Amino acid sequence: AIRDVYKRQLRDRAYKDNEMARSALLNVMVQAAMKAGRSLARDFGEVQNLQVSLKGPGDYVSQADRRAEQIIYTELSRARPDYGFLMEESGEVESKDGQHRWLIDPLDGTTNFLHGIPVFAVSIALERQGQIVAGVIYNPAMDELYTAERGGGAFLNDRRLRVASRNKLVDSVIGTGIPHLGRGHHGHYLVELRNVMAETAGIRRMGAVALDLAYVAGGRLDGFWEDGMHPWDLGAGILMIREAGGFVSDKNGGQDIFGTKTIVAGNEIIQKALLKTINKPI
């Protein structure tokens, strides 16, 4: 117990030190993400209790999602009242300044959360004139805070992030998302999955795309691809990977990631190889 208290003290001191190094804008985002994350962590404990109840946790999780989104909306609106919003739960709020828009996923990994699996995150990104300029991904279960600003690098807590340096697909572990009932073209995905399985060291499916992208930025995953994504899923993670020295494109090799709802990411070599592999003819 004493060791846990000491670790928390060190962590809190590191966060305070980092607050001094971050921009005022990023600090606002961090505070909003961590406040929402603490709310989710409390709710997650209750979800685990509801797993064994007759009612089940479904309604409670929906409330937790909305609570987290409201916390973020309140915090960011207070700090930057002229900025717009694009939120997973509440949709779009037009900006007053015509330039800035927050992209918010208050609970990425909802299904994991619902089933008591501690793999979920809060994701916040800021668009300025259509370009992502700042991003925060917070994993409450592991108390991992990922941050990035355009031109300022990407960080996990106080550690600078770099994408993995592997240069062969055969040595790489690749993340993906698997389409479920009523979503995505399963036949096309199975072809892509078969191709990637045949050329890599392994495939991981975390169920929280924001964390997948953060893991690519930090070198835990060598690459990632998925279809059917939304701006709030991808915004923060795209910036983190680029600021960590990685490459990101849509499945056509272009930059219309939000338009195509597709993403392929990794270091320069792995990203190109993964792009080629998933696009192999049937």
Model-assigned labels for residue ranges:
Residues R162-I282:
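An extended, acidic
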Residues L40, D65, L76, T110, ...:
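Residue-level signal for inorganic ion chemistry
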Residues K96-N157, V170:
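DPxDG-like acidic metal-binding loop motif
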Residues L10-L107, F247, I269, K276-N279:
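N-terminal subdomain of lithium-sensitive/metallo-dependent phosphomonoesterases centered on the IMPase/IPPase/PAP
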Residues V52-S53, S77, E92-S95, I137, ...:
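Short secondary-structure boundary/capping segments
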Residues A1-Y6:
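Short, small-residue-biased leader/transition segments that mark boundaries at the very start
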Residues M29, A33-A36, G135, A154, ...:
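Small-residue (primarily alanine) positions within well-ordered alpha-helices
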Residues R66, Q70, E89, P106-G109, ...:
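Generic detector of well-ordered alpha-helical packing
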